[in-house]
Amino acid sequence: MPNTSEKYKTDYYFKKEDDLNPIVFIHGVGLTKEIWSPQLEFFKDHNILTYDLLGHGKTPLEKTQLNFEDFTRQLLNLIKELEINKIHLVGFSLGSLIARHFAAIHGDKLSSLVLHGSIYKRSEEQKRVVQNRFELIKSDKPASKDRSLRRWFSDKFLKENKEIYDKIFSMLDENDHNNFLKAYKLFVNYEDDDQMLNNINTNTLVTTGQHDVGSTTEMAKNLSEKIKGAKYIEIKDGKHLCSIECSKEFNKAIELFVDQNYDNA
Protein backbone atom coordinates (compact mmCIF):
# COMPACT_ATOMS: atom_id res chain seq x y z
CA MET A 1 0.00 0.00 0.00
CA PRO A 2 1.12 3.63 -0.55
CA ASN A 3 2.75 5.16 2.49
CA THR A 4 5.20 7.79 3.64
CA SER A 5 8.25 7.12 5.77
CA GLU A 6 7.55 8.70 9.16
CA LYS A 7 11.20 9.43 9.83
CA TYR A 8 12.58 10.25 6.37
CA LYS A 9 9.45 11.49 4.49
CA THR A 10 10.02 9.25 1.46
CA ASP A 11 6.76 8.38 -0.30
CA TYR A 12 6.71 4.67 -1.16
CA TYR A 13 4.62 1.65 -2.10
CA PHE A 14 5.49 -1.66 -0.43
CA LYS A 15 3.69 -4.93 -1.10
CA LYS A 16 4.82 -7.90 0.96
CA GLU A 17 3.54 -11.36 0.02
CA ASP A 18 6.08 -13.63 1.74
CA ASP A 19 9.57 -13.69 3.24
CA LEU A 20 11.50 -13.53 -0.04
CA ASN A 21 13.71 -10.52 -0.73
CA PRO A 22 11.69 -7.76 -2.44
CA ILE A 23 12.33 -6.24 -5.86
CA VAL A 24 13.00 -2.51 -5.51
CA PHE A 25 12.43 -0.26 -8.53
CA ILE A 26 14.06 3.20 -8.82
CA HIS A 27 12.58 5.60 -11.39
CA GLY A 28 14.34 8.20 -13.56
CA VAL A 29 14.66 11.98 -13.38
CA GLY A 30 11.43 13.95 -13.56
CA LEU A 31 9.29 10.84 -13.07
CA THR A 32 7.73 9.10 -10.07
CA LYS A 33 7.17 5.59 -8.78
CA GLU A 34 3.99 5.50 -10.90
CA ILE A 35 6.01 4.59 -14.02
CA TRP A 36 6.35 1.07 -12.63
CA SER A 37 2.66 0.20 -13.07
CA PRO A 38 3.36 -2.54 -15.67
CA GLN A 39 5.89 -4.10 -13.32
CA LEU A 40 3.55 -3.95 -10.31
CA GLU A 41 0.96 -5.84 -12.33
CA PHE A 42 3.40 -8.41 -13.72
CA PHE A 43 5.14 -9.04 -10.39
CA LYS A 44 1.93 -9.06 -8.36
CA ASP A 45 2.93 -12.31 -6.66
CA HIS A 46 6.33 -10.93 -5.63
CA ASN A 47 7.35 -8.59 -2.84
CA ILE A 48 7.69 -5.14 -4.41
CA LEU A 49 8.98 -1.75 -3.23
CA THR A 50 8.79 1.43 -5.30
CA TYR A 51 9.37 4.96 -4.06
CA ASP A 52 9.60 8.60 -5.13
CA LEU A 53 13.13 9.95 -5.29
CA LEU A 54 14.06 13.08 -3.34
CA GLY A 55 12.32 16.09 -4.88
CA HIS A 56 10.05 13.92 -7.04
CA GLY A 57 6.39 13.02 -6.69
CA LYS A 58 5.36 13.22 -3.05
CA THR A 59 8.86 13.07 -1.57
CA PRO A 60 10.14 16.50 -0.47
CA LEU A 61 13.62 17.90 -1.00
CA GLU A 62 15.04 20.30 1.55
CA LYS A 63 18.53 20.78 0.09
CA THR A 64 19.76 23.37 -2.38
CA GLN A 65 21.99 20.79 -4.09
CA LEU A 66 21.82 17.04 -4.60
CA ASN A 67 24.46 14.35 -4.86
CA PHE A 68 24.41 10.58 -5.24
CA GLU A 69 25.20 10.10 -1.58
CA ASP A 70 21.82 11.72 -0.82
CA PHE A 71 19.99 9.26 -3.07
CA THR A 72 21.99 6.29 -1.76
CA ARG A 73 21.22 7.29 1.82
CA GLN A 74 17.53 7.68 0.95
CA LEU A 75 17.27 4.07 -0.22
CA LEU A 76 19.35 2.71 2.65
CA ASN A 77 17.23 4.56 5.22
CA LEU A 78 14.02 3.33 3.62
CA ILE A 79 14.90 -0.35 3.61
CA LYS A 80 16.23 -0.06 7.17
CA GLU A 81 12.97 1.52 8.31
CA LEU A 82 10.98 -1.24 6.59
CA GLU A 83 13.30 -3.83 8.20
CA ILE A 84 14.34 -5.27 4.84
CA ASN A 85 17.62 -7.16 4.95
CA LYS A 86 18.37 -7.66 1.24
CA ILE A 87 16.82 -6.57 -2.04
CA HIS A 88 16.83 -7.13 -5.79
CA LEU A 89 17.53 -3.63 -7.10
CA VAL A 90 16.30 -2.37 -10.49
CA GLY A 91 17.33 1.16 -11.50
CA PHE A 92 16.21 3.06 -14.59
CA SER A 93 18.12 6.00 -16.15
CA LEU A 94 19.06 8.31 -13.23
CA GLY A 95 17.80 5.46 -11.05
CA SER A 96 20.39 3.16 -12.61
CA LEU A 97 23.17 5.58 -11.63
CA ILE A 98 21.81 5.62 -8.08
CA ALA A 99 21.69 1.82 -8.15
CA ARG A 100 25.32 1.68 -9.30
CA HIS A 101 26.41 3.88 -6.40
CA PHE A 102 24.34 1.88 -3.93
CA ALA A 103 25.75 -1.43 -5.19
CA ALA A 104 29.35 -0.22 -4.94
CA ILE A 105 28.90 0.78 -1.29
CA HIS A 106 26.18 -1.51 0.05
CA GLY A 107 26.62 -4.70 -1.95
CA ASP A 108 25.84 -6.71 1.18
CA LYS A 109 22.26 -5.45 0.87
CA LEU A 110 21.77 -6.82 -2.65
CA SER A 111 20.75 -10.19 -4.02
CA SER A 112 20.87 -8.92 -7.61
CA LEU A 113 21.24 -5.70 -9.58
CA VAL A 114 19.54 -4.60 -12.82
CA LEU A 115 20.75 -1.44 -14.59
CA HIS A 116 18.25 -0.35 -17.25
CA GLY A 117 18.76 2.56 -19.66
CA SER A 118 22.05 3.49 -18.02
CA ILE A 119 24.51 5.93 -19.57
CA TYR A 120 28.18 5.02 -19.75
CA LYS A 121 31.15 6.92 -21.19
CA ARG A 122 29.23 9.54 -23.14
CA SER A 123 31.14 10.98 -26.10
CA GLU A 124 31.83 14.71 -26.28
CA GLU A 125 29.01 15.04 -28.80
CA GLN A 126 26.61 13.13 -26.54
CA LYS A 127 27.59 15.37 -23.63
CA ARG A 128 26.89 18.43 -25.80
CA VAL A 129 23.45 17.12 -26.76
CA VAL A 130 22.50 16.51 -23.13
CA GLN A 131 23.82 19.92 -22.04
CA ASN A 132 21.80 21.64 -24.78
CA ARG A 133 18.73 19.72 -23.70
CA PHE A 134 19.29 20.88 -20.12
CA GLU A 135 19.34 24.51 -21.28
CA LEU A 136 16.03 24.00 -23.11
CA ILE A 137 14.44 22.24 -20.15
CA LYS A 138 15.25 25.18 -17.87
CA SER A 139 12.47 27.11 -19.63
CA ASP A 140 9.87 24.55 -18.41
CA LYS A 141 7.92 24.86 -21.68
CA PRO A 142 5.46 22.14 -22.76
CA ALA A 143 7.50 21.55 -25.92
CA SER A 144 10.44 20.24 -23.88
CA LYS A 145 8.19 17.66 -22.21
CA ASP A 146 6.75 16.60 -25.56
CA ARG A 147 10.27 16.14 -26.94
CA SER A 148 11.15 13.97 -23.95
CA LEU A 149 8.16 11.72 -24.53
CA ARG A 150 8.98 11.33 -28.21
CA ARG A 151 12.53 10.43 -27.29
CA TRP A 152 11.34 7.85 -24.76
CA PHE A 153 8.59 6.15 -26.81
CA SER A 154 8.05 5.25 -30.46
CA ASP A 155 5.64 7.44 -32.44
CA LYS A 156 3.46 4.40 -33.09
CA PHE A 157 3.14 3.63 -29.38
CA LEU A 158 2.25 7.21 -28.47
CA LYS A 159 -0.34 7.36 -31.23
CA GLU A 160 -1.99 4.16 -29.99
CA ASN A 161 -1.66 4.94 -26.25
CA LYS A 162 -2.68 8.54 -25.69
CA GLU A 163 -3.42 7.80 -22.03
CA ILE A 164 0.26 6.89 -21.49
CA TYR A 165 1.35 10.13 -23.16
CA ASP A 166 -1.02 12.12 -20.93
CA LYS A 167 0.06 10.28 -17.78
CA ILE A 168 3.80 10.81 -18.31
CA PHE A 169 3.31 14.39 -19.53
CA SER A 170 1.33 15.18 -16.35
CA MET A 171 4.02 13.53 -14.26
CA LEU A 172 6.65 15.81 -15.78
CA ASP A 173 4.37 18.84 -15.59
CA GLU A 174 3.51 18.38 -11.91
CA ASN A 175 7.13 18.24 -10.80
CA ASP A 176 8.56 21.01 -8.69
CA HIS A 177 10.66 22.53 -11.48
CA ASN A 178 13.52 23.71 -9.25
CA ASN A 179 13.86 20.27 -7.66
CA PHE A 180 13.71 18.66 -11.09
CA LEU A 181 16.58 20.84 -12.30
CA LYS A 182 18.70 19.88 -9.28
CA ALA A 183 18.36 16.20 -10.14
CA TYR A 184 18.70 16.73 -13.89
CA LYS A 185 21.89 18.73 -13.40
CA LEU A 186 23.34 15.76 -11.54
CA PHE A 187 22.47 13.53 -14.50
CA VAL A 188 23.78 15.99 -17.12
CA ASN A 189 27.16 16.41 -15.41
CA TYR A 190 27.63 12.74 -14.52
CA GLU A 191 31.12 11.34 -15.03
CA ASP A 192 31.61 7.58 -14.88
CA ASP A 193 33.82 6.19 -12.15
CA ASP A 194 35.32 2.88 -13.26
CA GLN A 195 36.85 2.28 -9.85
CA MET A 196 33.37 2.46 -8.35
CA LEU A 197 32.14 -0.05 -10.95
CA ASN A 198 35.03 -2.35 -10.02
CA ASN A 199 33.61 -2.42 -6.49
CA ILE A 200 30.32 -3.93 -7.68
CA ASN A 201 30.36 -7.63 -6.82
CA THR A 202 26.63 -8.27 -7.10
CA ASN A 203 25.23 -10.42 -9.91
CA THR A 204 24.28 -7.75 -12.46
CA LEU A 205 22.10 -7.50 -15.56
CA VAL A 206 22.45 -4.51 -17.90
CA THR A 207 19.53 -3.80 -20.25
CA THR A 208 18.57 -1.07 -22.68
CA GLY A 209 16.19 -0.52 -25.57
CA GLN A 210 17.36 -1.29 -29.10
CA HIS A 211 16.54 2.26 -30.21
CA ASP A 212 17.44 4.21 -27.05
CA VAL A 213 19.34 7.27 -28.33
CA GLY A 214 20.54 8.48 -24.92
CA SER A 215 21.48 5.21 -23.23
CA THR A 216 22.65 3.35 -26.29
CA THR A 217 23.20 -0.35 -26.84
CA GLU A 218 26.92 0.37 -27.20
CA MET A 219 26.96 2.04 -23.78
CA ALA A 220 25.07 -0.87 -22.22
CA LYS A 221 27.35 -3.50 -23.75
CA ASN A 222 30.46 -1.63 -22.58
CA LEU A 223 28.99 -1.17 -19.10
CA SER A 224 28.20 -4.88 -18.84
CA GLU A 225 31.79 -5.69 -19.80
CA LYS A 226 33.11 -3.35 -17.10
CA ILE A 227 31.12 -4.88 -14.22
CA LYS A 228 32.45 -8.27 -13.14
CA GLY A 229 30.33 -11.11 -14.52
CA ALA A 230 27.51 -8.86 -15.71
CA LYS A 231 25.03 -10.02 -18.35
CA TYR A 232 23.58 -7.89 -21.14
CA ILE A 233 20.13 -7.97 -22.76
CA GLU A 234 18.89 -5.70 -25.54
CA ILE A 235 15.14 -5.03 -25.51
CA LYS A 236 14.04 -5.40 -29.12
CA ASP A 237 12.33 -2.36 -30.68
CA GLY A 238 12.52 -0.49 -27.37
CA LYS A 239 13.38 3.15 -26.71
CA HIS A 240 14.20 4.71 -23.33
CA LEU A 241 10.95 3.80 -21.55
CA CYS A 242 10.70 0.31 -23.00
CA SER A 243 9.84 -0.87 -19.48
CA ILE A 244 6.39 0.44 -20.46
CA GLU A 245 6.31 0.13 -24.26
CA CYS A 246 7.98 -3.30 -24.34
CA SER A 247 6.96 -4.32 -20.83
CA LYS A 248 6.39 -7.99 -21.69
CA GLU A 249 9.97 -8.55 -22.86
CA PHE A 250 11.42 -6.31 -20.15
CA ASN A 251 9.47 -8.03 -17.37
CA LYS A 252 10.40 -11.51 -18.56
CA ALA A 253 14.09 -10.57 -18.54
CA ILE A 254 13.83 -9.18 -14.99
CA GLU A 255 11.83 -12.17 -13.75
CA LEU A 256 14.30 -14.72 -15.10
CA PHE A 257 17.28 -12.85 -13.66
CA VAL A 258 15.70 -12.31 -10.25
CA ASP A 259 14.56 -15.94 -10.04
CA GLN A 260 18.16 -17.02 -10.66
CA ASN A 261 19.39 -14.87 -7.79
CA TYR A 262 17.10 -15.44 -4.85
CA ASP A 263 19.04 -15.30 -1.61
CA ASN A 264 17.27 -14.77 1.68
CA ALA A 265 20.22 -15.00 4.03
Predicted regions and their residues:
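Gly/Ala-rich beta-loop-alpha elbow adjacent to hydrolase catalytic centers
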Residues: G91-G95, A99
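Conserved alpha/beta-hydrolase catalytic His-Asp/Glu region
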Residues: E124-R128, K141-N198
